[in-house]
Regions:
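Anionic-ligand binding patches
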Residues: 3-10, 31, 46-220
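N-terminal beta1-alpha1 ligand-phosphate binding loop
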Residues: 4-27
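Flexible, glycine-rich phosphate/dinucleotide-binding loops
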Residues: 18, 38-40
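A short beta-strand-loop structural module common to alpha/beta enzyme folds
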Residues: 30-38
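N-terminal beta-loop-helix "entrance" segment that forms/cooperates
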Residues: 40-42, 46
Length: 220
């Protein structure tokens, strides 16, 4: 049985894989991708994905809320209640909650984002083949009443790949819009030797952890 949502969810991402994962666990949401330029000072993977996910969530929340920034010194619970306008039935509208997410691959300390060229994709896959790497996804849940930011890390091991296999995989175009230049849920699965941690985290969103965070705060 599907649990009732107590918030209006907005996904600040254009990723079709994240949309599929949210739908898979029965959440109702709308999509409004953030186009904010990514800008983070840290190069540590866990901190990086958390910061970028927060930037995306804040960007969309401010657009939808009319640019009213969150006041960290205010009584956020009171603000949330006061800003929920009643609908025609006299009931309070659900609180707006924006989900921001960002994923990177980290191989031997080097962060790999999405490849911007065929050459970059080949370089990434060459670095990943035959060894283990980590996939980090940061998630931010941003509302007027509370901000929650966390990340999950999953270890993935690849089989050795030949230059021909790498070239043919890039020909499929699958690597070009994915962190680390591969999709574990697609053709890239043929190169995966093992995984330790949350599979969905590698796809782009640790929905198990996400659901627990929503539930523990009364948003579900």
């Amino acid at each position: 049985m599907q649990k009732e949502q107590n918030v209006r969810l907005v996904l600040a991402s254009a990723s079709p894989r994240r949309r599929e994962l949210l739908s898979q666990i029965g959440l109702e949401f709308t999509v409004m991708p953030s186009t904010k330029e990514e800008n983070a000072k840290t190069t540590e993977a866990g901190a990086l994905v958390q910061e970028l996910s927060r930037q995306k969530a804040v960007d969309i929340w401010e657009q939808l809320s009319g640019g009213q920034g969150q006041n960290p010194d205010a009584d956020q619970e009171q603000i949330a209640e006061e800003t929920q306008e009643p609908n025609l039935n006299g009931k309070r509208q659900p609180e707006l909650l924006v989900i921001g997410a960002d994923t990177v691959v980290c191989c031997e300390g080097k962060i790999l984002g999405k490849p911007h060229s065929r050459e970059a994709a080949a370089e990434m896959l060459t670095a990943l083949q035959g060894r283990s790497h980590e996939v980090y996804t940061g998630v931010t849940l941003y509302s007027q009443s509370e901000t929650v930011t966390f990340f999950e890390c999953t270890q993935v091991e690849f089989y050795p790949m030949t230059e021909v296999e790498i070239s043919e995989y890039i020909d499929s175009k699958e690597p070009m819009d994915k962190a680390g230049a591969y999709g574990i849920q697609g053709l890239g699965a043929r190169f995966v030797k093992g995984i330790r941690g949350d599979y969905n985290n590698v796809v782009g969103l640790p929905v198990g952890r996400l659901y627990q965070e929503l539930k523990s705060r009364g948003w579900m």
